[in-house]
């Protein structure tokens, strides 16, 4: 049985960066309309829970893919930085209050924290699988 060759860490990282921006665009980037409840006047959005959950799941999968073939820090940053940048560009263009900067910081911290947890779990699972495969008869 031949060992699988790992893909280039640089190519993987660049692919994760591009797919992160694509995920942002598909799930969040095109939705800029806030919803107003006609009965109460409450304003919500622009994002709904299902689209945010789907985006988070895709970002987590991208961190896993990146972690399996690139340094952990590169995988986390390859998701957190471009996602935050894409979110920030849109938020800055549509926000007159200046609160986009606070939102950008929170998005960055959230994606860094979430990405770090996903990468850590991925590394633990990867090590356990490697240990099992070397001790298997």
Regions found by a protein language model. Give the residues of each.
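Central hydrophobic cores of alpha-helical transmembrane segments
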Residues: 74-85
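Residue-level signature of transmembrane alpha-helical entry/exit and packing/kink sites
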Residues: 9-13, 75, 99, 103, ...
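Short, Lys/Arg-rich, polar N-terminal cytosolic tail immediately upstream
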Residues: 1-6
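Membrane-water interface at transmembrane helix exits
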Residues: 28, 66, 90, 118-126
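Membrane interfacial helix motifs at helix-loop boundaries and amphipathic/re-entrant anchors
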Residues: 22-54, 85-109
């Amino acid at each position: 049985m031949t060992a699988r060759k790992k893909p280039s860490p640089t190519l993987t990282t660049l692919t994760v960066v591009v797919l992160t921006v694509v995920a942002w665009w598909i799930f969040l980037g095109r939705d800029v309309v806030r919803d107003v409840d006609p009965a109460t006047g409450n304003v919500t959005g622009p994002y709904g829970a299902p689209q945010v959950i789907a985006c988070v799941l895709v970002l987590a999968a991208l961190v896993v893919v990146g972690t399996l073939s690139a340094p952990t820090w590169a995988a986390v940053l390859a998701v957190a930085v471009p996602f935050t940048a894409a979110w920030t560009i849109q938020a800055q263009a549509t926000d007159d209050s200046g609160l986009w900067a606070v939102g950008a910081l929170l998005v960055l911290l959230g994606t860094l924290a979430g990405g770090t947890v996903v990468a850590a779990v991925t590394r633990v699972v990867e090590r356990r699988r490697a240990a099992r495969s070397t001790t298997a008869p």
